[in-house]
Amino acid sequence: MKRTYQPSRVKRNRKFGFRARMKTKSGRLILARRRAKGRSKLTVSDEKKKY
């Protein structure tokens, strides 16, 4: 059986990246909540690795 998590950096950034969050009102609310909580990484885009 194929496992459910098949990692892809492109798909991950398109769905959960900073620009994806900024596109929608609810996404901006997520960012606002995470800022208020004091998260060091707001989105997966902040996990800066060599792509």
Curated annotation (Swiss-Prot):
Which BP terms from GO are recorded? translation
* GO CC terms of this entry: ribonucleoprotein complex; ribosome
Coiled coil: which residue ranges? none
Disulfide bonds listed in the record: none
Pfam families assigned? Ribosomal_L34
Q: Which UniProt keywords apply?
A: Ribonucleoprotein, Ribosomal protein
For this UniProt entry, the molecular function terms from Gene Ontology, in alphabetical order, are: structural constituent of ribosome
- Give the family per the record: Belongs to the bacterial ribosomal protein bL34 family.
Protein name in the entry: Large ribosomal subunit protein bL34
Q: Write the lineage as a comma-separated list.
A: Bacteria, Pseudomonadati, Spirochaetota, Spirochaetia, Spirochaetales
Q: Corresponding gene?
A: rpmH
